[in-house]
């Protein structure tokens, strides 16, 4: 059993949770999220707290599902209350980004601009042409979209050029010995 799943999920002020047959709906000041539930876990709402327990009739995989659904519901509560944000930075000569309508337009050192469609539930903004901010309610969707941006030009280990997460450490490699003057 997950140790975190033993603790209740406390609901902040302004967040409402409703548990229907096979759905969990979390509403808050930033919006609402829905998650489908499974029969392996029992989710109960008591005194402004959510409890996630393994169902007593299931012996196959109860503990892993308990931890999974605890984390999913906890992320939903945090998402509708505060939201999630991933920031990326572009490092390289001529690298820049801009938001044009429903597309993120990237100039990343190829002959054509790269256009990435922005999901409707996310807000993407660009600061200083090289800092990209992805915001949204759903932690998984924010992370997936930020990872898809980073995958267009991951940072390379020699000069560090590419798209990286803010404060990400890129392990650098030494160049050829001939260039550094070593024998």
Swiss-Prot record:
Which domain of life does this protein belong to? Bacteria
According to its UniProt entry, the protein's GO biological process terms are:
cytoplasmic translation
Q: Name one GO molecular function term.
A: structural constituent of ribosome
Which segments of the protein form a coiled coil according to its record?
Answer: none
UniProt-listed HAMAP family: Ribosomal_uL6_B
Which NCBIfam families is this protein grouped with? Answer: L6_bact
Q: What does this protein do?
A: This protein binds to the 23S rRNA, and is important in its secondary structure. It is located near the subunit interface in the base of the L7/L12 stalk, and near the tRNA binding site of the peptidyltransferase center.
Q: What is this protein called?
A: Large ribosomal subunit protein uL6
Native source organism of the sequence:
Chlamydia pneumoniae
């Amino acid at each position: 059993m997950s140790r975190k799943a033993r603790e209740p999920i406390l609901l902040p002020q302004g967040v409402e949770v409703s548990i229907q047959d096979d759905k969990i709906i979390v509403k808050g000041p930033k919006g609402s999220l829905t998650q489908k539930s499974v029969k392996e876990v029992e989710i109960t709402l008591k005194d402004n707290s959510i409890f996630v327990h393994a169902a007593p009739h299931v012996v196959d995989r109860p503990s892993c599902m308990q931890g999974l659904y605890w984390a999913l519901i906890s992320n939903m509560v945090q998402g509708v209350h505060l939201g999630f944000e991933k920031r990326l930075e572009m490092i390289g000569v001529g690298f820049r980004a801009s938001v044009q309508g429903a597309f993120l337009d990237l100039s990343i050192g190829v002959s054509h601009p790269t256009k990435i469609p922005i999901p409707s539930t996310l807000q993407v903004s660009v600061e200083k042409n090289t800092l990209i901010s992805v915001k949204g309610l759903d932690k998984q969707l924010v992370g997936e979209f930020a990872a898809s941006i980073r995958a267009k030009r991951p940072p390379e280990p020699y000069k560090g050029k590419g798209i990286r997460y803010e404060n990400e450490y890129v392990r650098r490699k030494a160049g050829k010995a001939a260039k550094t003057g070593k024998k």
